[in-house]
Amino acid sequence: MLEGCILAVSSQSKSAKAITNNSVPGAPNRISFAKLREPLEVPGLLDVQTESFDWLIGADSWRQRATARGDVNPTGGLEEVLTELSPIEDFSGSMSLSFSDPRFDEVKAPVDECKDKDMTYAAPLFVTAEFINNNTGEIKSQTVFMGDFPMMTEKGTFIINGTERVVVSQLVRSPGVYFDESIDKSTEKTLHSVKVIPGRGAWLEFDVDKRDTVGVRIDRKRRQPVTVLLKALGWTNEQITERFGFSEIMMSTLEKDNTAGTDEALLDIYRKLRPGEPPTKESAQTLLENLFFKEKRYDLARVGRYKVNKKLGLNTDKPITSSTLTEEDVVATIEYLVRLHQGDTVMTVPGGVEVPVEVDDIDHFGNRRLRTVGELIQNQIRVGLSRMERVVRERMTTQDVEAITPQTLINIRPVVAAIKEFFGTSQLSQFMDQNNPLSGLTHKRRLSALGPGGLSRERAGLEVRDVHSSHYGRMCPIETPEGPNIGLIGSLSVYARVNPFGFIETPYRKVENGVVTDQIDYLTADEEDRHVVAQANSPLDDEGHFTEDRVLVRRKGGEVEFVSATEVDYMDVSPRQMVSVATAMIPFLEHDDANRALMGANMQRQAVPLVRSEAPLVGTGMELRAAIDAGDVVVSEKAGVVEEVSADYITVMADDGTRHTYRMRKFARSNHGTCANQRPIVDAGQRVEAGQVVADGPCTQNGEMALGKNLLVAIMPWEGHNYEDAIILSNRLVEEDVLTSIHIEEHEIDARDTKLGAEEITRDIPNVSDEVLADLDERGIVRIGAEVRDGDILVGKVTPKGETELTPEERLLRAIFGEKAREVRDTSLKVPHGESGKVIGIRVFSREDDDELPAGVNELVRVYVAQKRKISDGDKLAGRHGNKGVIGKILPVEDMPFLPDGTPVDIILNTHGVPRRMNIGQILETHLGWVAKAGWNINVAGADGVPDWAEKLPEELYSAPSDSIVATPVFDGARENELSGLLASTLPNRDGDVMVNEDGKAELFDGRSGEPFPYPVTVGYMYILKLHHLVDDKIHARSTGPYSMITQQPLGGKAQFGGQRFGEMECWAMQAYGAAYTLQELLTIKSDDTVGRVKVYEAIVKGENIPEPGIPESFKVLLKELQSLCLNVEVLSSDGAAIEMRDGDDEDLERAAANLGINLSRNESASVEDLA
């Protein structure tokens, strides 16, 4: 049975929990405004990766889960492929080779060493190979090494050649049978068709055309009457009439069919499939059998078999054994198509089962499945093994039977190459997004419809990209990229899981006779369509009864209506069940427009880790689980007492007497150049529980995700400096390093063997002053701690130059001074243009130390340079609601607007950024941020008791101290009336004054004049993120640099150290102002007049006047292009004479030719004698 069923044992009371994070020991107490009790913990957020890989390698943990699910004798992915392949027989069938029992040895090196030394984190794979000589019955068994197999780390990633990569799950159309409906343009008739799509093999398509005949296409070849196929399968006219007598169109198709009997039908099919080949009955029979009924050639896959059985009502209660088509499948498919065309709504199959007759929606999640990491790797291994199978067969025929052993037959190269190719080059094996922990977590939970066997951006239409009702609780409707991939790449919802068939399931609470139970059933999209589902916030009493007579529910296709409580089958487990992790971290999501929420979810992944992380005052309760599951914090494995704490490690003495040492990552570089640093948050002698966070990572505080900073924001225009989403910042954020981040760059150089001799890493560099070498050590490598700027030498290296024949004097010098006099050139590693920082690490690998290095490389040096980037004009900031902007001005603290108690605001945002974008969540966050920062106390002791607005709040929320952290979960957070009440109940400051009014606004004073602004301004605390789009990475200037070889114009872009293009529109602007000489200069001597450039430089150096410009190189290129199109283009002077366009090289050529006495003019000499 597909439905997973678990019983959630709830330890919470029936009321909402006021404190989140209770399930994790030692977690900070975040006060929650949630009204609803969630009966189910959020599942492991990396399970989609880890469980799939466990299935592939047949891990014990997976076997236990499969057995608990009720699977009998579960088979792992590798085992499955080897079973499919075995036995490999030779062409005569006299010998065979079988494989079984895949197993792994220990991994070769730990994760850190693999990253350090550019190795792959892999374990050797061994299988048992058994060779059987069928003639003699002799069996030879051996354990065979099948190559190093990349293993998944605990975090769900792979280390390939030292870089961390993620394999993204792929969304594909499931194998199965799909019925479709279309309108014929000429006759406006409704036509129906059906495709039988296998996992591997030929497609089988049936359709009813406008002439009302039923046809079949085999393997996308020409259409034939469907009765030809039935006859080829051995059916007689009488049998066809008996089964399909109810259908006029089948009878008319039979009448038009001219084939008589099985043999003729087989030959007819053979002629269509193999035109030009002489047909025989045997070859036709074999062809048809091979196409659809032989496992080697046709594979529906288990999921395809399951889908076909389910759709056509066949053998639904029997376990799935075969994965080929059967004759009954073909017949039932034809009957279903015919009944669909004549308008029937149900069909009774031979077993007496009734199935609904309807067309399929291919975008429905019942028809789209996930290929997770395990299946993707399994498919790649299958490709490698099939290549190996060919080699084995060839060797069986060529080698001596007596001498054959499994080892001599097997060549593992194709398998190893296939695995390497997948991890190294596949579209689905991606360089891990390590900007911050959330970006890594989201990357592992990504669902992509692109990739091999999937869609392509160009062909994907609107329907497949659109949000579908079956996505509910399975794929997030919010989080998807902007741009050409919109809708093709999604993110798994928080509670979703993947079942053994690859379909995404989501959990629901079972409702029995109008009573909501704590039993949890996981449903696929197909199963959900058969049920009536109530929403998570439907009011319940303490016994679980619906308090209202009519309950709002949804049915198939997302249709919403009110029904009585007894009709309800299931209820959502949580209001955040439909969204992904990143979206679930947006507070007040319910008040944001979806387009802006999409930007908010995506921009959280671009936040850079700051020097000091700060958890949000206003969170959603998702921060803790996201940070722990992302794997960048250190979690205690066992309960115990902390023995020793330092910056580099924590030692815990566990209760069972074992000692655990947890090592910290210190200032490591992530894939995106951000700084990954871990620091302990426990003290020596402190007791820790199992699962408790003992050290923070990047972007975390006390184990919670902390992507940005809580800043005091004023929402108002300010002198036009925050026009069009520009942002005004206080200089305090610069001085106090509030928004400062550390970025680490890796620079690498290797010393190789060249044809002229070996390169050498040395301090002895020709033509370099001592000041330049000051920071290099005796090896020629920069010292740790050195401040470096662009152009500084990091590693000195010299490369031998090509040498001419030495004179006797030079030979004497060489004999006296040795290698010193050798000709070398400086090829040192220098800091790239525009970069600077402090050297924080050096790694040296050399052959002498037995380090593994690529062929021809003797030594390799890596230098890590860290840069501390303060916030500056041009950097991009954003909130969590899609409210993004670029810093337009950084004001001195004294000029910033300030509150009546003298507190200056940190950041000023423009009011225009809110109304038309409809992301009101940012305003509500600002209000609640102020409430959390100031603290509150609801007056419940007054005459009226608890105010009306606070009736739904738990007692724990009646008061809170200042600097409290709160959670407002998505779709279940603080209401507007509660916010108004809390704003009126905030605690006064130390002077006894309340700064912000009940409406969330405060009187602000202008920092420059001290005068109050004429209107109250919304002031509060907003969580602001510093994004990866930093101005330091974008700003660029060039004086001299590289040119394009063809056009002789400077290259473009920062990466090429290019120039600024003076384009077509800029030329128009110059023309409009009549600046003819400026324009001429720009188009010639400042750009691509090669001769003029040199002359101008010479004139400037000598202090002479600038000479006349020449002809630009691009003009010559244009002439050449026109001439290549066979157009005779000539350049005429003012008096009409043709001007010869020659390249500078041509002039040199002519001069050389004249010296040699060769004539290069058009009237060439007729013979060699004429030259003499």
Curated annotation (Swiss-Prot):
Q: What is its EC number?
A: 2.7.7.6
Q: Could you tell me what reaction this enzyme catalyses? A: RNA(n) + a ribonucleoside 5'-triphosphate = RNA(n+1) + diphosphate
Give the similarity note: Belongs to the RNA polymerase beta chain family.
Q: What is the protein name given in its UniProt record?
A: DNA-directed RNA polymerase subunit beta
Output one GO BP term.
DNA-templated transcription
PANTHER family, from UniProt?
A: DNA-DIRECTED RNA POLYMERASE I SUBUNIT 2
Q: Which organism is it from?
A: Mycobacterium sp. (strain KMS)
Q: Reply yes or no: does the keyword Nucleotidyltransferase apply.
A: yes
Q: What NCBIfam families has UniProt attached to this entry?
A: PRK00405.1, rpoB
Q: State the UniProt keywords alphabetically.
A: DNA-directed RNA polymerase, Nucleotidyltransferase, Transcription, Transferase
What GO cellular component entries does it have?
A: DNA-directed RNA polymerase complex
For this protein, the record's SUPFAM superfamilies field holds: beta and beta-prime subunits of DNA dependent RNA-polymerase
* Assembly and binders: The RNAP catalytic core consists of 2 alpha, 1 beta, 1 beta' and 1 omega subunit. When a sigma factor is associated with the core the holoenzyme is formed, which can initiate transcription.
Q: What does this protein do?
A: DNA-dependent RNA polymerase catalyzes the transcription of DNA into RNA using the four ribonucleoside triphosphates as substrates.
> What InterPro entries does the record tag this protein with?
DNA-dir_RNA_pol_bsu_ext_1_sf, DNA-dir_RNA_pol_bsu_external_1, DNA-dir_RNA_pol_su2, DNA-dir_RNAP_su2_dom, DNA-dir_RNAP_su2_hyb_sf, RNA_pol_bsu_bac, RNA_pol_bsu_CS, RNA_pol_bsu_protrusion
Question: One MF term in GO for this entry?
Answer: DNA binding
